[in-house]
Every structure is written in C-alpha cells, then in structure tokens.
Amino acid sequence: MRQKLEEIKNSAINELKTTLSKDQLEAIRVKYLGKKGELTQILRGMGALSQEERPIVGKVANEVRSYIEETIKEAFSDIKNKEKSIRLENETIDITMPGKKQAVGKRHPLDLTLESMKDIFISMGFTIEEGPEVELDKYNFEALNIPKNHPARGEQDTFYINDNLVLRTQTSPIQIRTMENQKPPIKMIAPGKVYRSDSVDATHSPIFYQMEGLVVDKGITFSDLKGTLELFAKRMFGNKVKTKFRPHHFPFTEPSAEMDATCFVCNGEGCKVCKGSGWIELLGCGMVHPQVLRNCNIDPEVYSGFAFGFGVDRMVMMKYGIDDIRLLYESDMRFLNQF
C-alpha cells in the first residue's frame, strides 16, 4: 500500500512537470484527488487494513495528498502569472495616441434665457432679489390682495403644506418681502421656480420658472411701465418686434393689463401658433394696487409703482420655437445639444 502511494506521488509529479494549462491541472486534480481519483480510492480502502497498518498508511496517504494539492496550487499560480505577463506584453499602450474626450455638456435653454433676461433688466438698473420657495400664506396671497375665496387659493391650483404654508405659486411674495425690508425707491426683479397643481402636458407643468418685476417710487406712471416693457421686448426679441397692451384684471394691480408681442413664428402674419391673430401673450402687468402698498407700510398717496410677471418657460418656447414644455425638463441630450 505504501509503495502504491509512492507510485501515485511520483506519477503526479511527472505529469505536473509537463502541464501547460489550467485545464490540464484540473484534469490531474480530478485524476488523483477527485471522487473517483486514485488517491481517493486508496483512502476508501483503508478499512481493510489492520489496526497496526491503518495509522501508518493514513499518515503517508495524507502527506501524499497534501503534497499533490500544494504542487497543483503552485503550478496554477505559475500558469496564472505567465498568462498575465503574456497579456501585458500584448496589451501595450501607445501613450502617444490621443485620449478619448469626455462628452461636453450644453447650457440649458432655460438658463440661457434667464441669463439674457437678467442682463437686460440689470442694464436698466434693476436689482435681483430672492425669496423662499416654501412660502407663508401671508406673502403668497394675503398681502397681494388675494381674498380667502379666490380660486387661486384652492387645492386644485396650489400645493399646501399646511393651512399656513404653501409652495409658492408665483414669485410675487418676493416683491412683498422687498417692500417690507427696503424703503422706496425700489427697482427689482425676482426670478425663480414656482409650483402649481397642474397636470403635465405640452403646455403645463407643476414646476416652472417665473420672473416678476417691481418698481416703486414717487411719480411712477403707466407710461413708465409701458416704456420699460417695450424696451425689454426689443432687447430680448429684436427691434422689429411690436407690442400691444390689453386691459385685464389682477388682484394686486390696478389698472391691470396683458402685453402681447408679434408672433415669433409668422412675424405677425397669422399662423396656428398665434391662432391666426398675429399676436402672442407675453406677460401680465399693471400699477401696484394701493392696498398692496399699504400692506407693506408704503403710503400710496406718496408713492406709486408698477409690477409685471411672465413665465420664463413660455419665453424659452417662444424664442426657440419649442412646442412642448416637457422637453425642458427631460434632460434629453438629443434636445439639449441643439442649444
């Protein structure tokens, strides 16, 4: 039995010396150490040995098994290292070749339009003011002369956090905060995100950008409002653009108006976009309501002012001819790469 074990050991050593691959190593392991391997068969037959022979043969068998296992392990490591060396030699890198460029992003059309609008108003002497997106009812509705029973206060239009807190539905609250904290003269714009309880479709989104403006000083008239907005329209869309004002109603301005501009698709000749009228609604505006001034501790007998507001998303869509607002929020590089 001991002689047989020595023969198995020597046979395994000779085979391992000529082994060149992992598959060959695995075949040798199975031949000698597998369930039906030669060494395994001997170990299973030890029950037939005498009590004196059993520990002696068992010791030799375990030594042979350990030796074969260790030799296979070392051979496997050697083959692995050789394969790695060959792979590294074949995978040489030409460091003189140019690397792959990272994809370059594009500025979002909303960002481009917001920046253009800000630059125009800053050049006209306006400052930029900011405020919280989670707003008190007082600033979002009450101080703006919007009564408790106004439809805009309904849950179908407004996201309520609790009875006293809402996600701002407009950036007008920033105007109120500015009038509370600053003394006239005031000349500011308030760009930012606003929230409405709208279903998503081609022209509506529950989140969009708005920019509102406010001027308060002594002797401010509707002519000042008209001149400011006409100048903005020409700088934004070119000198050929025409504008007109239509009477309207807003709780926080009196008198109120909406300003239309010649259609950017048909240049005022009439098309599907402007529904054949040649005009597109651009923004809402008006003279600040006396009660709004009083709510901010500004005497309407001494000061007057005008306010205006427009959806930035709408401006983007008109400027670039985009017909679906959802494109502005989908982060689709095929769309964004066009700007």
From Swiss-Prot:
Its cofactor is Mg(2+). Mg(2+) binds at E254. GO terms for molecular function: ATP binding; catalytic activity, acting on a protein; magnesium ion binding; phenylalanine-tRNA ligase activity; transferase activity; tRNA binding. It catalyses: tRNA(Phe) + L-phenylalanine + ATP = L-phenylalanyl-tRNA(Phe) + AMP + diphosphate + H(+). The keyword Metal-binding applies. The keyword Nucleotidyltransferase does not apply. It is found in: Cytoplasm. It is an enzyme of class 6 (ligase). Its EC number is 6.1.1.20. Gene3D superfamilies: Bira Bifunctional Protein, Domain 2. Binds 2 magnesium ions per tetramer. GO terms for biological process: phenylalanyl-tRNA aminoacylation. Keywords: Aminoacyl-tRNA synthetase, ATP-binding, Cytoplasm, Ligase, Magnesium, Metal-binding, Nucleotide-binding, Protein biosynthesis. GO terms for cellular component: cytoplasm. InterPro entries: aa-tRNA-synth_II, aa-tRNA-synth_II/BPL/LPL, Phe-tRNA-synth_IIc_asu, Phe-tRNA_ligase_II_N, Phe_tRNA_ligase_alpha1_bac, Phenylalanyl-tRNA_Synthase, tRNA-bd_arm. CDD domains: PheRS_alpha_core. Its main location: cytoplasm. Tetramer of two alpha and two beta subunits. HAMAP family: Phe_tRNA_synth_alpha1 (MF_00281). Belongs to the class-II aminoacyl-tRNA synthetase family. Phe-tRNA synthetase alpha subunit type 1 subfamily. This is Phenylalanine--tRNA ligase alpha subunit.
